Amino acid sequence: IIALGVAFFSGLKITQSVMVHSADVYLKDLQFYDYRLVSTLGFTEENVEALADKEDVRAAEGAISAEVLYKDAGENERVIKMHSITEKVNKLKLIAGEMPQSADECVVDSALFSGDAIRSKLVLSENNTADDLDKFAYKEYTITGLVQSPCYIQFERGNASIGNGRIS
């Protein structure tokens, strides 16, 4: 019993350092951001370049994200957060399929979609506001792959100001 207790305690003691190391390697490999600046008015390319030119900034990129309603395979409306794909920061890890090659293609979160979603359509709902729909060049996107993002390392995908209030 003592040996079992010692083994259990040793396992618990080393687990933290192993988990921290694993998370550190994962986040470094995918270039997870250190700081995220958000503006309802947006940033200009000059703003992003000014940040990138700072001596202690390794990489800075502008990105766009928007919460929208889409229709799932059962025609139910769900909330999804769409992100532009960046090259230097918050790199995506491809799990299945391939990265988009054209503007009407997208990849989706492997925690929310299965491999069956590849080559299917992600259709934006007509119940989105006109302002939200105007943010997109297309109303329908072909899913080309499943990815993991360092922005979502937990089960929850966040809250939304539309739909049922949950990104799912």
Regions of interest found by a model, annotated:
Residues 10, 17-168:
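Basic-flanked hydrophobic alpha-helices used for secretion and membrane insertion
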Residues 1-17:
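Hydrophobic alpha-helical transmembrane segments of multi-pass inner-membrane transport and secretion
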